[in-house]
From Swiss-Prot:
GO molecular function, one term: small ribosomal subunit rRNA binding
HAMAP family the UniProt entry points to: Ribosomal_bS6
GO BP field: translation
Superkingdom of the organism of origin: Bacteria
Gene3D superfamilies in the record: 3.30.70.60
Name of the protein described by the UniProt record: Small ribosomal subunit protein bS6
Name of the coding gene: rpsF
Function in brief: Binds together with bS18 to 16S ribosomal RNA.
Alphabetically ordered keywords of this record: Ribonucleoprotein, Ribosomal protein, RNA-binding, rRNA-binding
Organism of origin: Dichelobacter nodosus (strain VCS1703A)
GO CC field: cytosolic small ribosomal subunit
Keyword Ribonucleoprotein: yes
Amino acid sequence: MRHYEIVFLVHPDQSEQVSAMVERYRAQIEAAQGKVHRLEDWGRRVLAYPIQKLVKAHYILMNIECDRQTLAELESNFRFNDAILRHMIIRRDEAVTEASMMMQEVKK
């Protein structure tokens, strides 16, 4: 199985459903014998540029380990979910478990 880093932006009006969305994606990954190594909720942040006339979005970061089929299903779910404005998936060489720079910045 390969390691991936996923960042997705959720519509600010759907912020209440973020935890349910994340749990659904986590269950989908774990059902396929995958693992979630890191999950960070960065909260509502200002976008660098407007997306669909919105200036804020709810950011989520996940570092996961899964097979290609599960990743394809996740990406399909991201595309067909109207609440997700953007998503980015990057393949990593190894699992990343330490806190990201965004979370370290929040703690200070």
